[in-house]
Amino acid sequence: VALGGSRCVPQWRNTMESAGIELGYMTPPLLAFPFVGTFRGSCAVGLAPKPGAYHVDHFRCEFAAFREGLFSTDFLGYTEVQGEYELPALIMTAGEDAFDALSAYSEWLYREGGCRRIERTQVPRWWLGPFFCGWGEQGYHSPTNVYAGANQKAYAAMSERLDAFGLKPSAIIVDDKWQRRYGELLPDPVKWPDMRAFVEAEHAKGRRVLLWLKAWDNEGLSSEECVKCLCTPYGADPTSPTYRRRIQETMRRLLSAEPGCFNCDGFKIDFANCMPLGRNLATHERNVYGIELLKRLMTLFYESAKAVKPDCLINNSCCHPYFAEVTDQCRLHDYNGQLRSLWEVREFRARLFKTAFPGISVDTDDPHSTSHAEMMNYLRRAPDLGVPDLYQLHRRIRDEDLREIAGIWEAYSARLEKSVDSKGGKR
C-alpha cells in the first residue's frame, strides 16, 4: 500500500485514489511512495532531480497489467537536450514505518540531493502564534460577498472583538481580498483608506499583521509579466524581469516602515496549486516549468520580502525539502467541512510537513466542520498539533466558546514563553 496520492490524504480514506503524486494542497508534496507489505518496515521509492531541474508536475506509480511497478513522470517537452542529459534519480529509502521511510527520503535530499537544510530552533516568538485569520469572519461582516468583507472597518471590528474576549493572538491575518487587484498586490484604497493606521494600531496591541497573498493570479498584470499559453496570459511569470521588479518594489511598499509604506509583517501564500500547467506554456526564461517554476516564484517572494524585513513570516503549504529555504512556516490548508475526519486528516498532513521540514512550525488553519463539537474539539487540541488559528468570532462560535479559547490560548502562550526562556529563543 502506498501512502500518497494527488490529494495528500490517507489512502485508506479514498477507495478510488489514484496512485499519482500531483500538485494539490501541498505544492509540491514529497515526491516519494512509501510501501508497506509482508516485509518488515517500509520502503520508499522517490524522485530526486538535481536543483534547477525540477521541471515536472507529477510522479506516478502504476500497478496495472504489464506495467506493474512502473514509476514515471513527464517533462512535457520543456527539457531540451544538446549532447548528454542525466535523468532525475530514483532513490530507495527504508524505515520502521511509512513516515520513517519518508524521513529518510527527505534526509537524503538534504544530505545528497542539494536541498538546503534550515536551522529552525530559534525563530521570532510571534511566529508561533496563536493567530487570528479574518477569512471566516469576513462572511459575517459581508454575508452576500465574503470578499467585500476584507475591509478596514470590518477588521477593526474583529480586532475589538478579540480584545473584548481577552483573545491575544500574536498576529492577525488579513485575508482575501484586501487587494485592489490580485496581481498588483496593493491595498484597495476604497476598502483600506489607511492600512498603515490599522497596522500601527495592531502593533500597539502587540500583534503583527500578515497579508493573504494569492499566487499566480495575473489580475492587473501586463502581458509582459505573465506566463502565456498560445499567446494568452495565463498567470504571473517569476522569470519575467518586469514582474520581478514589480514584486521587489511591492514588497518594499507592503513591509517597510518608511513613510508611504504599510509596515506589515509577512504573508500567508495561498493558491500555489493554481499554477500554469500543461503543454504550450511560454515563460520569459525558456523551458522553466512545473515545480521549478514554483520554486522561482516562492524564491522571488521570499528573498524580496526578507530584503525589506528579515524577521517577516512567510507561511505557505510547500511540503518538499527543495522548498525549505523559502518556507518559514507550513499551513495545513483547507478541509472539506462536509466530512467528519478533521483531526485525523490534519494530523496526517502535519506529519508530512514535519517529515519534509524537521523542526518547522505548523499553522493548524481553519477548524471548519459542519459539526460544532468537532470544530471545538479541533480548537482544543490544536496546541498539540502546531500554531492555534481561529477564523471566526461569530455565528457557530459562541461567546462561551471564545472565553474557552482565550483560556486555551493563554495556557499555550505560557508554555511557549517558558520554552523560549529555557532555550534562549528570539522574542
Where would I find each of the regions flagged by the language model?
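Alpha-helical scaffolding segments of alpha/beta enzyme cores, especially the outer helices
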Residues: 157-160, 193-204, 249, 253, ...
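Glycine-rich, aromatic-flanked loop segments that form ligand/cofactor-binding clefts
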Residues: 108-133, 165, 173, 194-232, ...
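Active-site-adjacent "subsite" loops/lids of carbohydrate-active enzymes
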Residues: 129, 139, 143, 147-152, ...
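Extracytoplasmic/secreted cell-surface and envelope-processing proteins
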Residues: 181-184, 219-222, 275-279, 323-325
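Active-site groove signature of glycoside hydrolases
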Residues: 166-178, 247-284
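Carbohydrate-recognition beta-sandwich/jelly-roll modules
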Residues: 1-170, 208, 266
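Glycan-recognition surfaces
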Residues: 219-245, 249, 295-424
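The substrate-binding groove and active-site-proximal loops of carbohydrate-active enzymes
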Residues: 131-153, 178-193, 229-248, 279-294, ...
